[in-house]
């Protein structure tokens, strides 16, 4: 089985129902004591209005020669951090790359973003997230990137970077979230008329099931979602532990398979972290799957000392920054802007990586994996499903 690092190297050659505001204040870098030796934490100012926190490896001293080293960017998803790449940064640096993993807009120690539910959601749209990445590259003194790698929601940022600016992003690795392509513009409506609306409302259909359900992405777009997780009864550390366990290969019920259609009867086959019980929040959903104390003590890929880093960051900020990304998707705002690129494809060398136990591959029935390989990406070097990994592939099986 091809390992995660080998694949990358080969490719590159306070109240429920009310928003809790996050105050954006400058914060110190991550202490060296929580980072593997050789990974450094620092800030880059004036990145599209952000003071961006990055983790960095393979760039020991500043000089004009440093920018000649090939740059690799690692983009995390939700609920993750730059820290999520800690296990692969040093191998990439040893292979000769300047490796940068930022806390993206809405996350971690990066500041300058609006954490209010009623605030500036537009700044979290995909085109502005790509602008964030472009601005970071420019601030670092680079004009191109040898490889941009994204996981989960970061997979889509990486995909759009490479589609919009292939002159800058020379290769791309998409992880856990397949890229189905640019949203289409309505076609031939002059002759055929507008497309017919869906015969039914998927959210009403899910709620009408014998076991009433709801889709997690639309739940994440609601006002109560942030405080449900941030102010949960079990505390942020326990919530994150249960959430990460539930979506990992350690949860043995993660046995994903393709779904036939975008219907309630098919969607309800997915685990509750994707198709939730209607009257529960995410905190209650994952609490049922909290691993035992002995299982936590035996966990090698995410020991409690590392989970504490996530708990500190999300305990300070909450989750609204990352949830704004979901709102831009479910509202249609992203799709409306990205239709500008209708028909365009990713043409740079590409690959896809996911865990074999990751439902993220199949969460959108209709074949996002197939669309990615057949239509959206023209230079796909390979799709790798990694044994022993669920959703957190670069952490579970680096």
Predicted regions and their residues:
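An N-terminal hydrophobic leader/cap segment in hydrolases
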Residues: 2-43
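Flexible "cap/lid" subdomain of the alpha/beta-hydrolase fold that forms the substrate-access gate
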Residues: 25-41, 52, 60-63, 69-71, ...
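Structural cue for short, hydrophobic secondary-structure segments
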Residues: 68, 74-77, 101
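Serine-hydrolase catalytic-loop signature spanning alpha/beta hydrolases and amidase-signature enzymes
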Residues: 79-87, 99
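Conserved alpha/beta-hydrolase
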Residues: 91-114
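Short glycine-rich catalytic loops that host catalytic nucleophiles or stabilize transition states
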Residues: 382-389
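Catalytic histidine-centered segment of alpha/beta-hydrolase-like enzymes
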Residues: 389-398
């Amino acid at each position: 089985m091809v390992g995660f690092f080998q694949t990358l190297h080969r490719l590159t050659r306070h109240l429920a129902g009310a928003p809790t505001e996050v105050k954006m204040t400058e914060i110190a870098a991550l202490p060296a004591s929580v980072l593997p030796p050789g990974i450094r934490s620092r800030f880059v100012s004036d990145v599209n209005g952000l003071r961006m926190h990055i983790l960095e490896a393979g760039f020991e001293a500043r000089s004009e020669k440093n920018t000649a080293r090939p740059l690799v960017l690692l983009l995390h998803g939700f609920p993750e951090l730059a820290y999520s790449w800690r296990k692969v940064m040093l191998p990439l640096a040893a292979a000769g790359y300047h490796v940068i993993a930022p806390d993206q807009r809405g996350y971690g120690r990066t500041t300058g973003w609006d954490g209010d539910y009623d605030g500036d959601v537009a700044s979290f749209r995909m085109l502005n997230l790509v602008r964030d990445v472009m601005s970071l590259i420019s601030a670092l003194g680079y004009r191109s990137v040898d490889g941009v790698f994204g996981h989960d929601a970061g997979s889509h940022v990486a995909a759009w970077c490479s589609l919009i600016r292939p002159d800058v992003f020379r290769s791309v690795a998409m992880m856990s979230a397949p890229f189905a392509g640019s949203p289409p513009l309505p076609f031939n409506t002059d002759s055929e008329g507008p497309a017919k609306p869906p015969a039914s409302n998927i959210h009403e259909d899910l709620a009408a099931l014998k076991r009433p359900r709801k889709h997690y992405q639309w739940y994440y777009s609601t006002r109560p979602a942030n405080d449900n997780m941030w102010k949960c009864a079990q505390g942020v550390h326990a919530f994150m532990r249960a959430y990460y366990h539930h979506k990992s290969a350690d949860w043995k019920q993660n046995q994903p398979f393709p779904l036939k259609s975008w219907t309630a009867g098919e969607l309800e086959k997915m685990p509750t972290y994707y198709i939730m019980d209607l009257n529960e929040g995410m905190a209650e959903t994952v609490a049922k799957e909290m691993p035992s104390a002995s299982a936590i003590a035996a966990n090698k890929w995410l020991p409690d000392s590392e989970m504490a880093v996530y708990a500190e960051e999300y305990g300070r900020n909450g989750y609204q920054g990352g949830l704004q990304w979901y709102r831009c998707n479910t509202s249609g705002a992203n799709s409306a802007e990205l239709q500008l690129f209708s028909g365009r494809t990713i043409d740079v060398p590409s690959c896809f990586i996911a865990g074999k136990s990751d439902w993220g591959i199949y969460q959108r029935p209709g074949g996002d994996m197939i669309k990615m390989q057949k239509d959206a990406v023209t230079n796909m070097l390979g799709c790798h499903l990694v044994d022993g990994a669920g959703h957190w592939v670069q952490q579970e099986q680096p």
